[in-house]
């Protein structure tokens, strides 16, 4: 009987060790190698759109540039790695993170709402708020967000802007990674009535295409926000390193140089405009 008891205890010990071994293997499988992978490959892969002026677009020399793009390039430079961009629409950029096709996404992504539940969010690289582009001739019949009911709102599907427009009763007209001139032309000719988006992006887009008769609706500003980069939830090590570099860029003035190049204003601090907070 004594021998049987001893054998039982041996079996329990062996089984316990086996379970611990399995647990260790499982922990190792979940190990965060997001930063070491980039360091070993010496390359950052960044998802962006290439159609969002002035955050991500092709210039006259056919070079991919823009505020978010240039910030990402500087991050890669300071990390001592090269950078490649993969171009998608908004849904594609988000999906590229979950599929592991990109290390992070850089495309004027807002850092508010439920986004933090699904992704890791970088340090803010821009403070902004939202506005509406309408026709010059008649303001598209819009004087407030309440007037969106029945109007045709243009944008990419599943964005916070389109969700907000829908909440106010707008009819959604969706585009797939369209260029700014297409968006603005469609508002001007009546195919659509309004575009909800980031104020600074809209301001620069309207200024860059002065022959298209559209404008930003004055004094109707809403949802103060911050923008930055998106990371997959599991990529904490890479996220933390990029955040370290972004803080360094803020401290030494490099981030200021980049945003003044594209926005001609200080987007490092919240605006002093009167801005309405609405639900998204």
Residue ranges and their predicted role:
Residues 95, 109-117, 164-167, 189, ...:
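A ligand-binding cleft/hinge motif common to bilobed small-molecule-binding domains
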Residues 31-108:
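Extracytoplasmic small-molecule ligand-binding "clamshell" domains
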Residues 35-37, 135-153:
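Flexible hinge/capping segments at coil-to-helix
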Residues 26, 69-78, 159, 228-266:
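Extended ligand-binding regions for polar small-molecule ligands
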């Amino acid at each position: 009987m004594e021998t049987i008891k001893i054998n039982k205890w041996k079996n329990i010990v062996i089984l316990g060790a086996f379970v611990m071994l399995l647990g260790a293997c499982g922990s190792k499988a979940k190990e965060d190698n997001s930063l070491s992978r980039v360091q070993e490959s010496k390359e950052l892969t960044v998802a962006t759109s290439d159609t969002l002026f002035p955050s991500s677009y092709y210039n006259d020399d056919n070079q991919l540039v823009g505020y978010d793009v240039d910030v990402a390039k500087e991050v890669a430079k300071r990390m001592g790695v090269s950078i490649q961009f993969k171009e998608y629409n908004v849904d594609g950029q988000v999906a590229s993170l979950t599929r592991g096709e990109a290390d992070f996404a850089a495309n004027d992504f807002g850092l508010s709402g439920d986004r933090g539940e699904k992704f890791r969010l970088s340090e803010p690289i821009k403070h902004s708020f939202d506005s509406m582009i309408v026709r010059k001739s008649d303001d598209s019949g819009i004087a407030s967000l309440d007037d969106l009911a029945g109007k045709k709102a243009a944008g990419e599907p599943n964005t916070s802007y389109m969700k907000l427009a829908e909440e106010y009763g707008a009819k959604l007209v969706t585009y797939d990674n369209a260029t700014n001139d297409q968006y603005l032309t469609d508002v001007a000719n009546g195919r659509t009535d309004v575009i909800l988006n980031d104020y600074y992006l809209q301001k620069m887009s309207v200024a860059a295409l002065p022959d298209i008769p559209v404008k930003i609706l004055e004094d109707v500003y809403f949802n103060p926000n911050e923008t930055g980069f998106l990371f997959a939830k599991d990529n904490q090590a890479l996220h933390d390193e990029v955040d370290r570099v972004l803080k360094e860029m803020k401290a030494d003035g490099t981030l200021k140089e980049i945003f003044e190049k594209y926005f001609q204003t200080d987007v490092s601090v919240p605006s002093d405009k009167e801005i309405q907070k609405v639900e998204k």
